[in-house]
């Protein structure tokens, strides 16, 4: 009996449709047809408008804004499972709820663990994501997780800038590992920002560990939310004699007054990805598309090839 060839099909959640189309283009495929029906009370229902029986399907969608996009992904996974897809991969460029990776005070949930269980229960047989806020989230899943790093895009970009006296900086102690990995690749020094918070998104004090005077500084982080930490760090570094301050952040949440803070700060440039759709444009924000990265990895996953070269920290 001849071996049955498994077809690969790519679908997008509604809020990530532009990125999904770009990924499909780089993959060399046509984006699959999904109908999103919405009831008058706000409830919605996705339906695949083509057969996916026996296929390997990739469902692309970032979970930001968190609740509705997550629910849409879960419903699409469930629909794919019930339609007898053979392999169901949830491609989640930005994995929301990742800041809830541990119980850091009494009577709080571990949200990231819960989301992992929901995705698997809904039907995901594999997860592809990028720059998780906490690496240990991979261990919350029983299914395979391909955790990609945007550094495979950012590092060549930074190298092409040919900056003299380059210093890599982390905006907090938690990002020190990432900063040292970038610094090793770029053969540069490292600076760490030490900050104290009054509450979430409110910084009471910040200090620098390391020298920035006469340096071109690049801050590296996995996400930028309100941009409070980022802009405060940039302004402090310029006060301490830095020649310039740029930032590299994978996921541009850019909520609240983030764009205004960036425009008013001494940050020269924010380099980010399209893992989350932009709310507005800014001359200071440079977006590098992650579509080709995901397309390559999805192609290798489908053809059972290694993706190790994409694991540049």
Enumerate the language-model features and the residues they cover.
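PRPP-associated nucleotide enzymes
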Residues: 1-313
């Amino acid at each position: 009996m001849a071996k049955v060839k498994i077809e690969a099909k790519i679908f997008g959640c509604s809020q990530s449709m532009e990125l999904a189309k770009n990924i499909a283009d780089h993959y060399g495929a046509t984006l699959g047809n999904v109908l999103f029906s919405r009831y008058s009370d706000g409830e919605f229902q996705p339906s695949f408008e083509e057969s996916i029986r026996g296929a390997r399907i990739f469902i692309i969608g970032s979970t930001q804004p968190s609740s509705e996009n997550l629910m849409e992904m879960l419903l699409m996974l469930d629909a794919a499972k019930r339609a007898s897809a053979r392999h169901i991969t949830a491609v989640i460029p930005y994995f929301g709820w990742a800041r809830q990776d541990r119980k850091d005070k009494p009577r709080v949930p571990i949200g990231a663990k819960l989301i992992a269980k929901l995705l698997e229960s809904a039907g995901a047989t594999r997860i592809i994501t990028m720059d998780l806020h906490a690496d240990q989230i991979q261990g919350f899943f029983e299914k395979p997780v391909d955790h990609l790093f945007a550094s495979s895009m950012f590092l060549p970009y930074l190298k092409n800038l040919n900056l003299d006296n380059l210093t890599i900086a982390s905006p907090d102690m938690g990002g020190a590992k990432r900063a040292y990995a970038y610094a090793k690749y770029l053969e540069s020094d490292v600076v760490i920002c030490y900050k104290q918070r009054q509450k979430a998104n409110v910084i009471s004090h910040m200090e620098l560990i390391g020298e920035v005077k006469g340096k071109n500084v690049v801050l590296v982080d996995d996400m930028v939310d309100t941009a409070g930490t980022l802009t405060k760090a940039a302004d402090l570094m310029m006060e301490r004699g830095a020649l310039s301050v740029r930032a590299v952040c994978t996921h541009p949440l850019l909520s609240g007054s983030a764009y205004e803070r960036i425009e008013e700060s001494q940050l020269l440039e924010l380099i980010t990805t399209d893992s989350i759709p932009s709310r507005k444009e800014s001359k200071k924000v440079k977006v590098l598309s992650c579509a080709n990265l995901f397309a390559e990895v999805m192609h290798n996953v489908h053809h059972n090839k290694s993706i190790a070269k994409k694991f540049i920290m």
